[in-house]
């Protein structure tokens, strides 16, 4: 535990974005765009927050929506996340009172390597700038995330073909947003008119390359968040991953040193990540699986391996 540099921060971003399949495809891709736009806008207006921390906050800004929606009304949650690419409609359907913003803040706060102010900004990422009663740097960061959210939502509504009309719609969505600070709005419009940056900001690549490495303790908190998102996808696996992690910890406590035991617990939290590729129709099927369904189910083990990270020593 005294060895602080074991797991690359890049691994968390890669694992999080690997969830962008099936029901989580749109929300994770949206989160990735918000992460990149938030970082770019925060840099543009000269905010003091570290760019990597801004990126992570943007990446996690809607995790509270997944948690709230899945717990409160699972059937509506699955139907909406699977069939409605317009995430703004999902928010209006499942969270009219914007409670998910505070939940996202709480989730980010429990990840030890995310800056407290960046996590706090998530509380206000749907709040008009003039209504935020907090530190100005927090308010401006929240407004950058709000602008990034607005841009991404407009893009995803028209994402089949990126055309002149799509770009106009994105610019207009920013111009019409009365909740944006003038400086943030100007930076957002300028960004949309700069084709050099726009391609990278809208693609499906992470564009995240950090030199930071995390201890087992730090990464375990992030692995718990990933495990929560995995388990929330199906009521049949709601406590499965955490149960496996707890039992793994108990079994390894007497057999391994502390660091190796923690690595095993992290592996337990991530052991079913490949199951994201398995359709719910197969996961929830009553009775025996047919031959094809069995093959599909078994492929998730290979997907697990592709999604895991390399440990640096």
Briefly describe each language-model feature range.
Residues 2-313:
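Histidine- and acidic-residue-rich, metal-dependent catalytic cores
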């Amino acid at each position: 535990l005294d060895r602080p540099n074991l797991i690359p921060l890049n691994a968390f971003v890669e694992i999080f974005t690997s969830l962008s399949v099936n029901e989580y495809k749109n929300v994770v891709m949206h989160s990735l765009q918000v992460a990149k736009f938030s970082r770019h806008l925060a840099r543009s207006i000269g905010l003091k927050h570290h760019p990597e921390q801004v990126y992570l906050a943007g990446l996690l800004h809607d995790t509270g929506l997944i948690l709230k929606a899945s717990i409160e009304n699972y059937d509506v949650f699955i139907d909406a996340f699977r069939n409605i690419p317009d995430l703004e409609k999902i928010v209006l359907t499942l969270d009219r009172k914007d409670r998910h913003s505070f939940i996202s803040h709480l989730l980010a706060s429990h990840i030890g390597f995310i800056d407290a102010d960046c996590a706090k900004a998530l509380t206000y990422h749907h709040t008009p700038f003039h209504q935020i009663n907090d530190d100005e740097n927090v308010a401006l960061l929240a407004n950058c995330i709000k602008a990034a959210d607005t841009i991404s939502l407009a893009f995803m509504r028209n994402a089949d073909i990126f055309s002149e009309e799509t770009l106009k719609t994105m610019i207009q969505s920013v111009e019409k947003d009365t909740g944006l600070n003038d400086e943030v709005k100007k930076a957002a419009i300028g960004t949309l008119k700069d084709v050099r940056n726009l391609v990278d900001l809208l693609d499906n690549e992470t564009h995240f390359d950090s030199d930071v490495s995390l201890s087992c303790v730090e990464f375990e908190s992030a692995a718990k968040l990933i495990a929560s998102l995995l388990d929330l996808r199906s009521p049949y696996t709601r406590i499965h991953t955490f149960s496996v992690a707890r039992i793994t910890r108990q079994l390894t406590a007497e057999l391994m040193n502390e660091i190796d035991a923690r690595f095993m617990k992290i592996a337990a939290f991530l052991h079913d990540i490949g199951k994201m590729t398995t359709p719910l129709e197969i996961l929830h099927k009553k009775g025996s699986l047919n031959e094809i369904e069995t093959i599909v189910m078994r492929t998730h083990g290979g997907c697990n391996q592709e999604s895991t990270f390399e440990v640096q020593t």
